[in-house]
Regions:
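Residue-level detector of conserved catalytic or cofactor/ligand-binding positions
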Residues: 283-289
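C-terminal active-site/capping subdomain that shapes the small-molecule cofactor and substrate pocket
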Residues: 232-280
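Glycine-rich oxoanion-binding loops at beta->alpha junctions
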Residues: 3, 26-33, 37-62, 106
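A conserved active-site cap/scaffold subdomain adjacent to cofactor or substrate pockets
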Residues: 117-178
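Active-site cofactor/substrate anionic-group-binding motifs, chiefly glycine-
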Residues: 1-30
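Phosphate/pyrophosphate-binding betaalpha-module
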Residues: 71, 75-134
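Internal helical hairpin/lid segments
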Residues: 156-247
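A glycine- and small-aliphatic-rich helix-loop capping segment at beta-alpha/alpha-beta transitions
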Residues: 8-13, 37-44, 84-94, 114-117, ...
């Protein structure tokens, strides 16, 4: 759900400001308005793939002659690691490290989408951080959901529970991933993020702007905010009108309903971000269409 504009911002930093971009591998092929980070690399941009924000901070320390920006994306699961990298950069005295933040929070997305869903399949790893209390509270608004794990057995169990409970005809919440997810979640991770980040309005690819669903660094940490550090202009991305990732994410259509699915849009040449990740429904569906 990282928007086109974020990819365009990263490309701007790389090509216009000469910044070395550190990023997770999947993000390299996500399309921007005119190109992806892979395309920018072909034009001379320095795009360095890392496995964690800590790797990006380490790279900055080892290359003091380069300005380094980590692309901080993901949800509650990955946000704490980005925060820790900023803390480490301050402790290490690095003035060449920053993060471009596009982290998102799920509760606001649930609120925005609750009227269009019968049942939410809540992501287990997110709830491992946030806990389940917010999801439980949504049942009072008539919203049903189950927390699922990530193995095939865990997913099928959660779906089976959801189907049975849905047929009972009243709002419900069931934690089907209790070995990892608790009511309170990770207080340590929550406190870290609360210390360093604050909520902001945020654009989701295919879903538009969801109020207070994004994160940004608090004022006391803003020297590590790439947008402020490089006085970046407002960049308005232009999504490909043929892309239906947003509709697929909301369950409004199947991947095969998209006119470019498996034709103009393939894992090798993705038009939408959902075709990039090997874990996405669209990517998984493509070989069997």
């Amino acid at each position: 759900v990282t928007p086109v504009s974020f990819i365009d911002e990263a490309i701007y930093l790389a090509l216009e400001k000469g910044v070395t971009i550190c990023t997770f591998g999947d993000l390299v092929r996500v399309p921007g308005t005119n190109m992806s980070l892979a395309g920018a690399r072909e034009q001379g941009a320095k795009i360095h793939v890392v496995y964690s924000p800590a790797d990006a901070e380490k790279y900055a320390g080892e290359h003091p002659d380069e300005q380094v920006t980590f692309l901080s994306v993901g949800f509650e699961t990955t946000t704490p690691a980005g925060c820790l990298s900023v803390k480490a950069a301050r402790e290490d005295g690095l003035d060449n490290y920053s993060i471009l933040v596009a982290n998102k929070t799920m509760p606001q997305a649930y609120e925005a989408l609750k009227d269009s869903a019968d049942v939410f399949l809540y992501p287990g790893h997110v709830n491992a951080i946030t806990g389940t209390r917010l999801c439980e509270a949504l049942t009072e608004e008539g919203v049903s959901g189950v927390v699922a794990g990530f193995t095939a057995k865990e997913l099928m169990t959660a779906l089976a529970v959801a189907l049975v409970k849905f047929q009972e005809g009243k709002p419900f919440f069931v934690n089907c991933y209790p070995r990892v997810v608790t009511q309170d979640g990770s207080r340590e991770a929550q406190l870290l993020v609360d210390e360093m980040m604050e909520a902001c309005d945020c654009e989701w690819r295919g879903l538009g702007v969801i109020p207070r669903s994004g994160m940004k660094l608090r004022q006391e940490w803003q020297e590590f905010d790439a947008r402020l550090k490089y006085q970046m202009p407002k960049i308005e991305g232009k999504p490909n009108p043929a892309c239906r990732c947003g509709d697929v994410l909301q369950g409004k259509c199947k991947p095969s309903d998209c006119k470019v699915f498996g034709k103009g849009c393939t894992p090798q040449h993705p038009i939408g971000a959902c075709m990039v990740s090997g874990l996405s429904l669209i990517h998984i569906s493509e070989p069997t269409r």
